[in-house]
Amino acid sequence: MDDHTIDSESTEKQYNVAMVDRAMKILDYMLKSESTAGISQLAKYLDLPKANVFRIISTLEKWGMVERDPLFENEYRLGKALIVYGQKAKKDINLLSVAKPVLKEIAQDIGETANIGVLHENQIVILHSEQGEASILVSILPPTCSLHNSSLGKVFLANMPDSDIKGYFTQTTFERQTANTITSYDEFSKQKDQIITDGYSLEKEEWEYGLSCIAVPIKDSTGHLLAALSVSGPSSRMELKNYDTIIARLKQGADEIINRLSTER
């Protein structure tokens, strides 16, 4: 998100990790090459000792990013894991392109910030936010949110198997950011059934005092949870605008996104 962007040449150098940079150069070389590549060839390209290149290649092979050519044992090519990553990226890009106009409409209708988020490694990544007319006075949500104290997160948490929910709460100790913050499985279990049954999650000053958020799931025709859609704003304004009205508009938006995704396939 723009307010979290750090833009400077010195910062780029500071956070550049040499080993990761070299690994990416190997992948880029293989992408542009018309044939497979061997250790000697890559070592010459990177101007590195063969032993260093072999260690990088071995790690990439472990993660499926590269694989040995079945006809030439000491030659490598891009691995099939990249197909999975590419398909996931394509799906998120398609989702985002379809969701953006819907988010804009919701933000205009409600007058608050509309957000869409996806699950990534036990946290929510905010793919995009649109601000409504009144939402300019509200701090923008961070680029990631926790599962236990955000409406977007609680949608995903409620749809997980019970064993995974218990594991989430037992593996980490959560601090209360406000008096309303959920920090245990027992606390969340009181909300889980409501979230599933009613099809929405309400977060009322659990992340930050004065801020409330409502989210609904975006599920495909098979019931798979793709993302979550939310509206966030000052608690006082959200209550005045009527939660039921916001929930209905969010559910309508979720249906619109799914319908548009279906027609694009």
Report the location of each language-model feature.
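Amphipathic alpha-helical effector-binding/dimerization core
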Residues: 72, 77-171
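Cysteine/selenocysteine-centered motifs that mediate thiol-based redox chemistry or coordinate metal-sulfur cofactors
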Residues: 164-167, 172-173, 254-265
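Short, solvent-exposed recognition segments
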Residues: 3, 138-207
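Extended hydrophobic
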Residues: 180-253
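N-terminal helix-turn-helix
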Residues: 2-93, 255, 260-263
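Short, structured helix-loop boundary elements
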Residues: 16-20, 39, 75, 79, ...
